Each structure stands twice: as C-alpha cells, then as structure tokens.
Amino acid sequence: INNCAYGEENDECTSLVNQDSDGDGTSDGDEVYGLNNTYNYTSDPMEWDTDNDGLNDGLEITNCVYGEDDDECTDPNNEDSDGDTISDDNEIYSYYSNPMDTDTDDDGLSDGTEVTNCIYGENDNLCTSPIAPDSDYDGLSDDIEIFNCIYGEDNDECTDPRELDTDNDGVGDEDEIN
C-alpha cells in the first residue's frame, strides 16, 4: 500500500476505485483493519482466499454460524480453524461437520480421526461419521465400539461401529453387549 502510485498497474496494491479489490465480498478496509465481529479477524485484501482452504475470506469473516450462540466464525488465516486435521472447506462441504468443533458429534472421536482412520469393511475403506455419534445406529456410540474391545479369546476384538450386527449372528451389537 505504501509503494502504490495512483494510475500504476500493480498487483500488490488495493484498488482506489473498488472497495473490494479481491472480490471476496468484504471491503479492503475490513480485511486490513478487521471486521467488527467476535474475533476481529483480518485477511489479505488482495487474496480471495487468504488461507487457501476453499472458502473465500468474505464468507469466513461474515458467516458466523457456529458455536452455541451462532457467533463463531472460521479463521480466514487458518485453513483448519479447529485443528482437527480437516480443512474448513471439507468440513462444511464434504463432511457437513462443524469447522469450529474438533468433535462435532461429541462421541469422543475427533472429526479428523473419524474421516481418516477408515479401518472397517472388507477393504478397510469405511469410516465412522463425524456428525453421528452412533454411525450404525445400533445403540452403541462409536467410541464404545472402538475402545471397548471385550470379545474374542483375549478380549481384544471390537464390534464394528459401521455394522448393526458385527458377527452377523442375528443379535444386534447393543443386545450382545448389554
């Protein structure tokens, strides 16, 4: 901004005639000085998506719909606002999980763990759901099925949180455990 001469073509300068140089829906002034919201986030007025997470800065700064009071915003300077290893863009558009909560479904497993540790199914390609605490709806939460391994000769076998009846014996997992 300091080395910008009026009328000069310079990709590093904000526009003198356009209040939103990068076209992200937030004025250059709000991006530089911070929009008056809970977090007062700033972002680069020359970058449509400062953190390269797939969400434009204007959306991240103004779309504050997370948290108990729907007043939490994703951070336009951090592609993973909650630090769960899933980008904000993927949480919103791919997994429908909360980019401001590391464990959206409160089942004791982080969203990142649920979508990256896909160890179920014949090809070990099935994951638990980051938005359903009981992915198979069998009455046992995913964390209980994963961490309470009480079957087999050495009590080291677990029920599958993706299957209603892991051993296919006609008795559901919840009934067998209870």
Model regions and ranges:
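Extracellular calcium-associated, cysteine-rich motifs in secreted modular proteins
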Residues: 1-178
